[in-house]
Amino acid sequence: TIRGEECSAYWPAGTAAFHVNADIAMAFERYRVVSGDDSIEKECGLAVLVETARMWLSLGHHDRYGRWRIDGVTGPDEYTAVVRDNIFTNLMAAANLRSAVGACTRHPEAARDLGVDNEETAAWRDAADAVYIPYDRELGVHPQCEGFTTLREWDFTENTKYPLLLHEPYVRLYPAQVIKQADLVLAMQWQSHAFTPEQKARNVDYYERRTTRDSSLSACTQAVMCADVGHLELAHDYAYEAAL
């Protein structure tokens, strides 16, 4: 937290996890789409979408090639913190920005009351359209964040005490390809349109070998994506784990 009592065990795993703002924004958008009910959006959702969009624009920047990038964030994987261009964060931020534009279009008077003008919504749209998504062409996979696939491999045969956060210092976890919970895999579930079926399959295979089961939040997403790419036995195992 910025105000009040701190509740995160370690600030890079808490304060830098800006993606939570986009997660909440998505909840408003999905409720509207599924229910067809615009009333909650008008009452409070619009303000959430506008203020989170403003936050994303303050965090991101266009580089010299015109790509919109976000630095210094932590994605869902808390074993990889304060990184550049976490794909889950970037895609969710872009979706948040587009949702804010749509909400302001649906409720123009309420948007004006919040100080939103055409110039601001155009900036949101430009950022979303230019969002940078890293890709490792040599390996044929998406790095969870910029440079992730070049980090040292984690020795899973030697480090067998789980959860790792209770047995290993972060100074060992952060520079390695070891993942607490679904991150890039979660991006493929929540922002499925951004990946081809072939990319999904290669990404699932790559990240499955590097993901611990240190978070109960992960199994349901891994079940969905394993089923999506045809790993049905593994999907069943994860679904069973998620139900426990």
Residue ranges of model-derived segments:
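Acidic side chains
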Residues: 23, 37, 77-78, 85, ...
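Active-site core of glycosidic bond-cleaving carbohydrate-active enzymes
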Residues: 17, 26, 30-33, 43, ...
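Beta-strand segments within the central parallel beta-sheet cores of soluble alpha/beta enzyme folds
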Residues: 41-50, 68-73, 114-115, 237-241
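Aromatic-rich carbohydrate-recognition surfaces in CAZymes
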Residues: 1-59, 89-90, 97-100, 104
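Generic, ordered loop/turn and secondary-structure boundary motif
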Residues: 19, 41-42, 69-71, 80, ...
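Carbohydrate-binding/catalytic loop surfaces
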Residues: 1-13, 67-86, 142-156, 170-171, ...
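Acidic/histidine-rich catalytic neighborhood
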Residues: 4-8, 55-119
